[in-house]
């Protein structure tokens, strides 16, 4: 909203014109979210400790996790608050793509909050019943998918971009809604599954959001979009502001979530961040790119699917424990080693994903 104020003030002082530059707003969006998160962290942690809102730890999990019992959770509230305030300050309020992401971020944040509340306040280890969680995730995702389809149905916004092939961009039509639904819900739950170690989920989220910031900038620039053979989407540029806000809020949260964590994000953070990343990927027409850059989330999810499927079909487990990060813990890897190695893999996958934009 400060952009509109700056457009008015530029009549009196030309220096306010700097607010119209996307690169400037991207930088200050990151810094704003980072500062808010760093400021809010100690206050939120102290408040959660006062309310005794602590993490519930599985009794069948790694023994090293027992010491985490009671660590404040629902720290994702600081992430959501930081992102929302930063985006509202620095993005154009008239941009429909921005509102689609915020709708998912806040909507999934509410679902996650209810789940966390039932777990840590009402001491219900199962939290929100799975079918109700999936129901509300579906309703919110479908509402966003219909909105996104209505915005872009007559533009390249409903084309499917296939990596490595510049001339293969099938028009999805109404199938766009179905694809958007699965990407949003799937990514939300994938990030949620990954959030099992200190800092494990937030850093890959930061990497992927940073990668999408570059993609959004290119997609919203007619010259670079043509150069990379990706659809030009005039609303896409403002998603840079959203992505950098996620990066800033994520780094601020990591300050308190790094090993040994002072706070966990909880479902209020993981479901919301995953949903936001999925929505950004759909809006940019880069669902396949999300699979590559978010490969850590994909592998974590597949490990759970394979583990459950193998046990039901053969009565045997593939991994010592799923998601796969627990498998490595039970193999004797120290938690920091698992975390940092997953970070390195995530960064590599983001760089590989960005490289595919040119390899066509």
UniProtKB/Swiss-Prot annotation:
Which cell locations does it reside in?
Cell inner membrane
Its pathway is: Cell wall biogenesis; peptidoglycan biosynthesis
A GO biological process of this protein is:
peptidoglycan biosynthetic process
- Write out the transmembrane intervals: 26-46, 72-92, 94-114, 132-152, 168-188, 199-219, 236-256, 263-283, 288-308, 338-358
Per its Swiss-Prot or TrEMBL entry, what cofactor is needed? Mg(2+)
- Does Transmembrane helix show up as a keyword for this record? yes
User: What InterPro entries is this protein classified in?
Assistant: Glycosyl_transferase_4, PNAcMuramoyl-5peptid_Trfase, PNAcMuramoyl-5peptid_Trfase_CS
Q: What's an example of a GO molecular-function annotation for this chain?
A: phospho-N-acetylmuramoyl-pentapeptide-transferase activity
| Broad class of the protein's primary localization | membrane
Topology with regard to the membrane? Multi-pass membrane protein
Superkingdom is Bacteria
UniProt EC number: 2.7.8.13
* Annotated keywords: Cell cycle, Cell division, Cell inner membrane, Cell membrane, Cell shape, Cell wall biogenesis/degradation, Magnesium, Membrane, Metal-binding, Peptidoglycan synthesis, Transferase, Transmembrane, Transmembrane helix
Reaction(s) the record says it catalyses: UDP-N-acetyl-alpha-D-muramoyl-L-alanyl-gamma-D-glutamyl-meso-2,6-diaminopimeloyl-D-alanyl-D-alanine + di-trans,octa-cis-undecaprenyl phosphate = di-trans,octa-cis-undecaprenyl diphospho-N-acetyl-alpha-D-muramoyl-L-alanyl-D-glutamyl-meso-2,6-diaminopimeloyl-D-alanyl-D-alanine + UMP
What's a single GO CC term here?
plasma membrane
Q: What does this protein do?
A: Catalyzes the initial step of the lipid cycle reactions in the biosynthesis of the cell wall peptidoglycan: transfers peptidoglycan precursor phospho-MurNAc-pentapeptide from UDP-MurNAc-pentapeptide onto the lipid carrier undecaprenyl phosphate, yielding undecaprenyl-pyrophosphoryl-MurNAc-pentapeptide, known as lipid I.
Family label: Belongs to the glycosyltransferase 4 family. MraY subfamily.
NCBIfam families according to UniProt: mraY (TIGR00445)
Protein's recorded name: Phospho-N-acetylmuramoyl-pentapeptide-transferase
Supply the gene name. Answer: mraY
């Amino acid at each position: 909203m400060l952009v509109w104020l700056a457009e008015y003030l530029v009549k009196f002082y030309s220096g306010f014109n700097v607010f119209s530059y996307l690169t400037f707003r991207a930088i200050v969006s990151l810094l704003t979210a980072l500062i808010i998160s760093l400021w809010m962290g100690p206050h939120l942690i102290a408040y959660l400790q006062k309310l005794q809102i602590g993490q519930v730890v599985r009794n069948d999990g790694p023994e090293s996790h027992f010491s985490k019992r009671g660590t404040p959770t629902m720290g994702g509230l600081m992430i959501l608050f930081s992102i929302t305030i930063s985006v509202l300050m620095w993005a154009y309020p008239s941009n429909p793509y921005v509102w689609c992401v915020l709708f998912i971020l806040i909507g999934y944040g509410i679902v996650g909050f209810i789940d966390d509340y039932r777990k840590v306040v009402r001491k219900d280890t199962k939290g929100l019943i799975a079918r109700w969680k999936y129901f509300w995730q579906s309703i919110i995702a479908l509402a966003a998918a219909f909105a996104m389809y209505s915005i872009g149905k007559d533009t390249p916004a409903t084309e499917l971009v296939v990596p490595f092939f510049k001339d293969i961009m099938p028009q999805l039509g109404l199938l766009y809604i179905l694809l958007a639904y699965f990407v949003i819900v799937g990514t939300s739950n994938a990030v949620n599954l990954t959030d099992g170690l200190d800092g494990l989920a937030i850093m890959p989220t930061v990497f992927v959001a940073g990668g999408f910031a570059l993609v959004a900038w290119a997609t919203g620039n007619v010259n670079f979009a043509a150069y990379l053979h990706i659809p030009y989407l005039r609303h896409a540029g403002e998603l840079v502001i959203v992505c950098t806000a996620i990066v800033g809020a994520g780094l601020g949260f990591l300050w308190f979530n790094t090993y040994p964590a002072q706070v966990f994000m909880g479902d209020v953070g993981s479901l919301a961040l995953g949903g936001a990343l999925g929505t950004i990927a759909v809006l940019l027409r880069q669902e396949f790119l999300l699979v590559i850059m978010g490969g850590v989330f994909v592998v974590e999810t597949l490990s759970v699917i394979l583990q459950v499927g193998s046990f039901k079909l053969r009565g045997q487990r593939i991994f010592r424990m799923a998601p796969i990060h627990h498998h490595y813990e039970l193999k004797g890897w120290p938690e920091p080693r698992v975390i940092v190695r997953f970070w390195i893999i995530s960064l590599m996958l983001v760089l590989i994903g960005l490289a595919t934009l040119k390899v066509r």
